[in-house]
Structure formats: C-alpha cells, structure tokens
Amino acid sequence: MKVLAIDIGGTKIALGNVVEGHLQHRKQFPTPVVNDATTLAKEILAHCQAWLSDVDAIGISTTGLVSEQGISAINPGTLSFPTPFPLHSELHRLSGKPVKMLNDAQAAAWYEFLQLSPELDVRNMAYITVSTGVGGGLVINQQLHKGKSNFAGHIGHTVLDPNGPLCGCQQRGCVEAIASGNAINAGAQALFGQAISNIELFQLAQHNEQASTLIQQSAEAIAQLCLNLKATLDLDLVVIGGGVGLARGYLARVQAFIDKQPLVFQVKVRAAVGDYDACLLGAAFQFEESNLS
C-alpha cells in the first residue's frame, strides 16, 4: 500500500511517501498560522503534488484531540488552529483519497508496537513523545487504546505537582508544563537571560551544571510519569520519542531515575525505532487494522 503520511506538529508539518511500510521520501515545512482547514489542506497538497497521484490513501497524525469533527488543541500554546479543525475532510474533498486521522502519539504508539519482536511478549506499552509538548499513546492487551472520546493517552496533562507551573490546558503542574521542550526553553531563558535553543542547551549541559539541571528536571518528570503508568497499567515497556526524548543522553537520565525506585514500579524504557519519524510512520500505519481499536 502507498500512503501519503502527514504529521502535524506545533512547530513543523512533516510529509512522507510511505510505500509498503517504508518511508521513501520525506519533506517538512514550518507549521503555518492559518484560520481555515482548506488553506492548510491546499498548502499540504502543493508540497507533495509529485506523490499524490500514486498514493492509495492519506494518513494524518496530529497533536491534539482528534474527533469526527476535526482537530482540537488541548493546549493552544502547542497548536494554534481554530477548533474543531476539519483538516481530514478537506484533504479528502480536495484529493478524492480515503483519509484517516489519529492523535500523533497514538499513531506512534501503534507503529512502535507493531515493530516489536513477538518474543518480547509485550501486552501493555506506552509511547511518550517529549517534544514541543508531551504526548502519549497506550497499547493495552495488544490493542491501541483510544477511549470513547479518543482522549486516552494524553498523559502529558496528568499532574505531577498541583502547585507547579500553569499549563496551557489550564491545570497546574502537568508533566507538559514541567518536562516539555517549551518548558525547558522557558526555564533556560529565565536562567540565562537570553534565548537559547534546546539544541544549544543540550550542548551546554555537557559542561554547565545549570543547563544540566534543567534537562535533569525534565527527565525526572518523565521518569516519574513512567513509574506512575507502571503502577496504573502494569506496563511491560515504555517507548520514548520526540526531539527532546531522543536527544543525546536524555533517555539514560530517565532510565537512571527509574532504576533508583522500588523494583515493583520499575519499567524498561527504550528509544523509538521510528526515531524522529515515529509519528509520521504511525500516520501511515493506521491502515494496518489488526487490533487497532
């Protein structure tokens, strides 16, 4: 099967030509500020016009809550589209192709689960993306768990500290408000008094204790989330992805914190095999229907 895969993020939109499960071509462009889905759908199709006639279907993965009506941002700070944003229906109307849409972390969770060796006998798994925000997807009893309203897996908006920083979702102390790329970036600017990208911060952390502490705070928040999920869902595995989650040394910090806790709460973490494109590949793998609830 040939699928046009689209991954909608807070800062970029990635496009992929996925043929029989393999990413053949890829491109991306900055997420634009748009007021209607038709404008964005036309821009997306213009970027991949050379692939369009050859694909069988279009798969979308997106940050936010996905419903039949479209995309709704849980945290408007990570996605500024008006809601609900009917991108899927506009892409179908303009292209004539069948279109499916999933939350990005749910899509990545399903892709990552399908890549696991059967010998691992993983029944319950979580995927956590640490990027602009913090998202998640859950596979329970070897089925993607979305819930009645597709809200399952929004674990970035579980609260670690009720007195913590205000999140864009209007709760205080969410994992996203403590551990996300946006949170790290805000902390770095407050600490150093100037704009520092997260790439620069990770480089600085190799020899600067303050920078290292900022990253450690994020990693420990994600580790605590993993521990909580193990206690709640008896997870066999947590897969971590995203620009921050896959940054050099980050996963080791998460696992080291987990390994210091009581054994019953510990869970193995591993990097996404889809690397930075797990969500993009997950967009295409929606058409792998087996156990996709």
Curated annotation (Swiss-Prot):
One of its GO terms (biological process) is N-acetylneuraminate catabolic process. Zn(2+) binds at residues 157, 167, 169, 174. The keyword Repeat does not apply. It catalyses: an N-acyl-D-mannosamine + ATP = an N-acyl-D-mannosamine 6-phosphate + ADP + H(+). SUPFAM superfamilies: Actin-like ATPase domain. Signal peptide: none annotated. InterPro entries: ATPase_NBD, ManNAc_kinase_bac, ROK, ROK_cs. One of its GO terms (molecular function) is zinc ion binding. Keywords: ATP-binding, Carbohydrate metabolism, Kinase, Metal-binding, Nucleotide-binding, Transferase, Zinc. ATP binds at residues 5-12, 133-140. It holds the Pfam family ROK. Gene3D superfamilies: 3.30.420.40. Pathway: Amino-sugar metabolism; N-acetylneuraminate degradation; D-fructose 6-phosphate from N-acetylneuraminate: step 2/5. Its EC number is 2.7.1.60. NCBIfam families: PRK05082.1 (NF003461). Belongs to the ROK (NagC/XylR) family. NanK subfamily. Catalyzes the phosphorylation of N-acetylmannosamine (ManNAc) to ManNAc-6-P. Homodimer. This is N-acetylmannosamine kinase.
